[in-house]
Amino acid sequence: MENSSAASASSEAGSSRSQEIEELERFIDSYVLEYQVQGLLTDKTEGDGESQRTQSHISQWTADCREQLDGSCSFSRGRAPPQQNGNKDNSLDMLGTDIWAANTFDSFSGATWDLQPEKLDFTQFHRKVRHTPKQPLPHIDREGCGKGKLEDGDGISLNDIEKVLPTWQGYHPMPHEAEIAHTKKLFRRRRNDRRRQQRPPGGNKPQQHGDHQPGSAKHNRDHQKSYQGGSGPHPSGRPTHHGYSQNRRWHHGNMKHPPGDKGEAGSHRNAKETVTVENPKLEDGPGDTGHSGLEPPCSPDTLTPAASERPTPQLPGGPEAEIKHKDTVLPERLRERPKITLLQSSKDRLRRRLKEKDRDEVAVETSSPQPSKMDRLMEILNIMRNNSSDVDAKLTSFMEEAQNSTNSEEMLGEIVRTIYQKAVSDRSFAFTAAKLCDKMALFMVEGTKFRSLLLNMLQKDFTVREELQQQDVERWLGFITFLCEVFGTMRSSTGEPFRVLVCPIYTCLRELLQSQDVKEDAVLCCSMELQSTGRLLEEQLPEMMTELLASARDKMLCPSESMLTRSLLLEVIELHANSWNPLTPPITQYYNRTIQKLTA
């Protein structure tokens, strides 16, 4: 009995304890569950707050970066705010700010040549303005990254880091840099081609550049009428190979041209490489076959009557070589020289250059829509045109007369138009007209500047230059001449040249070299303008000068060009090789005598 009662009591006690334990566990579980629910809600609320703060911070940072980027890029492109233009129509001013931008460029304001940025971006002449792309930043799931709950596409990939961070557009290579790199690559490729062509198939032997035996193969056929008829080396002792491939440039590989073309191109090669030649050689006339190669033996102009002025140089190889040389030359002397026809304005410029200008032979027309006010001004212009002495005093009197007679914007425009038309129609007057425009640049009537009207006229003719070339060649050449003279003479208030004119001038000079209508006149105009403004143009934009001189070399080496064209282009190339410094008197005399004989 006692045992059974004790067992029942212990079982009741155990069951009561187990019930208490179960109730305690349920109680603890309920609290734990409540705490877990509250904790999750708190974590989620805090996470959302952090995400919102992060997103707002990123958005603000992105906006600030965009503002800085837009501001820096706008001024890095060289454009100033429109408030800098002080003229009344927002397309005219100048001297107060010296801000220029041509409407041939893609500018934001559509300004004319009379607006210039502090740093003109010449690359706008070739490309469009690139705008900075604005990409929103993706949302960053901080909670997912921290708890290992990252889903595909929600995180940041190092490969796509530029999608997250703001992209700086200011250091990307510009298109003009790619063009320059491509041009350099082409130059290197052409140089390698020339070097490969100069290597003989059997190794470098002196016989290739020296003696040409009559019994040799194809090489002898190419050079059988070289400078000594194939009997001896070059009179000047220099190799006769050229550095340009005519087969590649002009497709003359079929041997249908005269066999002296290779000697001709070789002499041009020697002329390009030996700029500093001894003065006695430079004094020789164009009939000297040992000179720099302006006149190849295959041309009818090869032996001009310069042999009568000086004794014939002794040729290597003895009297036999000299007799052979004379036998080769005499039939060519009997040929008639092709006549070179130049425009009257080109002849006038040549006479002025050669100090043979006749000041009384050209009559200047005097047409004025307002005779009462313009007669005196036209008279002063005619005096300056016919008599180039004491120009400064005449310029001063013209300015005083213009200030006294100009009382309206229309009258100022008439004065500018009169000077412009006279300078364009008479190229010999272009330099004097440019000096006059430089002195009157600050002249202003009713808020309109003299310089603004002048540049607007230049810009207008530049836009229609193709029609001008087809309709009136004289006016086309006169416009280019006056444009270059204005660039070389006029200066801003800070003493800087008008950089907005650089690209238009390069364009016009390139078109002169490519002209097929009046070749000699166009090349003469290009040559004389490069001699006067070449240094300044190269300082402003050397890459385009390199391209222009490459075109000049190609044209000079083209067999179809005349002797006058080659002489003018060679003089420019030699002047550039001398860093645009004046050539020595013997070299200058040589070119002057050559031009006189070729244009006689």
Curated annotation (Swiss-Prot):
Composition skew (Polar residues), residue ranges: 52-62
UniProt GO cellular component terms: perinuclear region of cytoplasm
Acetylation in keyword set: yes
Modified residues (Phosphothreonine): 289
UniProtKB keywords: Acetylation, Cytoplasm, Nonsense-mediated mRNA decay, Phosphoprotein, Translation regulation
Pfam families for the chain: MIF4G
Low complexity bias spans: 1-18
Residues found modified as N-acetylmethionine: 1
Biased composition (Basic residues): 183-198
Complex formation: Interacts with NCBP1/CBP80; the interaction is direct. Associates with the eukaryotic translation initiation factor 3 (eIF-3) complex.
Protein family: Belongs to the CTIF family.
Entry protein name: CBP80/20-dependent translation initiation factor
